[in-house]
Amino acid sequence: MDKSMLGDLDGLPEEDKMRMAAMVDQLQIRDSLRMYNSLVERCFTDCVDTFRRKTLDKQEESCVRRCAEKFLKHSMRVGMRFAELNQGVATPD
């Protein structure tokens, strides 16, 4: 976890800071797993039509790859925009 996120907690006892850091870590893990599961579900649903064999055919594999790349690029852009908005709110004019 980025310790600078806890900068406003300087007045708290060290034990509470540690507890807050652990909570933030758990939330980040939960959000990462949620994003991964969403990616898998979306790309699988969009790209895999039949269950003829154990492996994906070339068309399915290509579709999954493109889908995952789009999803990750979109997620990164949303995260960057969110950070920009948060930075604008945190910085007084």
Curated annotation (Swiss-Prot):
Annotated motif Twin CX3C motif, positions: 43-67
**Gene3D superfamilies given in the database record:** Mitochondrial import inner membrane translocase subunit tim13 like domains
UniProt-listed Pfam families:
zf-Tim10_DDP
The record's subcellular location field reads:
Mitochondrion inner membrane
- One GO CC term of this entry? mitochondrial inner membrane
**Keywords of this entry:** Chaperone, Disulfide bond, Membrane, Metal-binding, Mitochondrion, Mitochondrion inner membrane, Protein transport, Translocation, Transport, Zinc
The question of whether Transit peptide is a record keyword is answered with no
Q: Which SUPFAM superfamilies match?
A: Tim10-like
Kindly list the GO molecular function terms attached to this UniProt entry. Answer: metal ion binding
Q: Give the UniProt record's GO annotations in the biological process aspect.
A: mitochondrion organization; protein transport
Q: Does the keyword Transport apply?
A: yes
- Which residues pair up as cystines? 43-67, 47-63
InterPro entries reported in the protein's UniProt record: Mito_inner_translocase_sub, Tim10-like, Tim10-like_dom_sf
Q: How does it sit in the membrane?
A: Peripheral membrane protein
Report the domain of life of the source organism. Answer: Eukaryota
- Present the record's domain note: The twin CX3C motif contains 4 conserved Cys residues that form 2 disulfide bonds in the mitochondrial intermembrane space. However, during the transit of TIM9 from cytoplasm into mitochondrion, the Cys residues probably coordinate zinc, thereby preventing folding and allowing its transfer across mitochondrial outer membrane.
Give the family from UniProt: Belongs to the small Tim family.
**What is known about its subunit structure?**
Heterohexamer; composed of 3 copies of TIM9 and 3 copies of TIM10, named soluble 70 kDa complex. The complex associates with the TIM22 component of the TIM22 complex. Interacts with multi-pass transmembrane proteins in transit.
Purpose: Mitochondrial intermembrane chaperone that participates in the import and insertion of multi-pass transmembrane proteins into the mitochondrial inner membrane. May also be required for the transfer of beta-barrel precursors from the TOM complex to the sorting and assembly machinery (SAM complex) of the outer membrane. Acts as a chaperone-like protein that protects the hydrophobic precursors from aggregation and guide them through the mitochondrial intermembrane space.
This chain's protein is named: Mitochondrial import inner membrane translocase subunit Tim9
